[in-house]
Amino acid sequence: MKKETKKKIVSGFNQILIFLGIFIAITWWQQKDMLPTSSSLRAPNFSLVDMTDNVVHFNPSEQTQKTLVYFFAPWCSVCHISIDNIESIKQSSDGKINFYAVALDWKSKQEVETFLAEHDLTMPILLGTNETLNDFKIGGFPSYYVIDSNGILQSKDMGYTTEIGMRVRLGLVEL
């Protein structure tokens, strides 16, 4: 192999390492204020109204299966892209996982309905409050928490995630 070719390969590899380092640093920075995932921290309880004005209660100590809680804002363009990934996962999970989508930072129920009109969703859509935002330490949209069957925070993420990335976090795909 020529010396120039080796230099280009090394340079490309170094650029990939720099990109990965920056990506990891940004991801850490985005998630640093979210609730920690650990072997003992239970997810917060909530009682929120759904889009048909029914109250939905979530108590992690009563969990019997894994749950994904997806927090979105109706004005968030990334949320428009990622919520369809979540719905696709829900459709294929055969009811083995609970799914909740929680609207935050909304001004009116109509604003949330306008967002939902662009998506064919079957998961419960809940109207979150400032208390919900604070309890789950949501600092950006979309944000996700995976909660295990014991109510323990297992995984978290903020920003766009691919469908395969979320399937891995939910344990639906093994690497």
Question: Which ranges hold each PLM region?
Answer:
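Structural microenvironment flanking redox-active thiols in thiol-disulfide oxidoreductases
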Residues: 80-119, 128-134
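Short active-site neighborhood of thiol/selenol oxidoreductases, capturing the structured segment around
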Residues: 57-80, 99
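N-terminal targeting signals for export/organelle localization
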Residues: 1-49
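Thiol/disulfide oxidoreductase modules built on the thioredoxin-like
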Residues: 117-121, 127-174
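Short, small/polar residue-rich loop motifs at catalytic or cofactor-binding pockets
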Residues: 42, 65, 139-141
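Generic structural signal for well-ordered beta-strand positions
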Residues: 56-57, 154
